[in-house]
């Protein structure tokens, strides 16, 4: 297979956009038929390895593979040679699966060095910025993720419909910006301009935007994911509240935690002695741990969560300290294994809240520990260079 035109990829370009540009430059108006030709070429090289190579542009990223993405990664290596691109450049704009997780249990995607929660990946049509298509001729990967609702460069809302009402998804309609239904150029609406949404988009693009935190990009996406979890909303759209939250940080977070605790204590169905961490703090605590990791330097949400717990642990006769935990929750909180927890019990470092039989083995789901004991264990044994008390008590 010979490609006469070999465009280079752009750093913020989506993989789908790059394939569309390569197809168009080499005489294919429809990227589907280009992918059919590419698959035929790959099958001639190795029929078994490339049998699952997709001809649907929406499935071209390695993460889309149902079982594993190795064959698609190999395919991208071959295509980088065809287009005279360095493999690292082409693989760098692809969305891959990643072993990291965003709390409480969201898988991660990785693009270059940027880790993004899969929960933010759009499932329907991908909106676009008509100005970007007209000026740059390619699509940004950020358009694929909710939270990025406005183009930070042109200050216009991303659109997914032409003024005629037809859906415009660049993956199928192309990068020309021309509606396939009415033949007119799509245009950005100047109405309902939201400066706050534009500021969030600029922040997600890497700009320093006050009052939003100056943290690495992966954490910015993580904080958007976290906000969608704790605000009980399917979409991270309340831009005013999100900005106000950071405007008054960290008091806004302490107030949010206190409100959650008071509400859960007031409406709990269990007796006070049987209350668990997940009943009172679970929603906020366990959604804050991996964003995408627990490094206090950048995961300032988790840092403030621990600050709040330490400050209020023994308030009201230890109502937080006496919350119950099970072994699985301890593993999450301390970032350790069940075997380590078992060893700490045997050494007397972590006392259960009841007397164990001589050869009794605790069930991992039994709420046999107190938060106060677990927190004190963290203080004495489990602090690390990036996950330690000095980050929020440096004045000492």
State each model region's role.
Residues 1-396:
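Basic, alpha-helical nucleic-acid-binding regions used in initiation and control of genome expression
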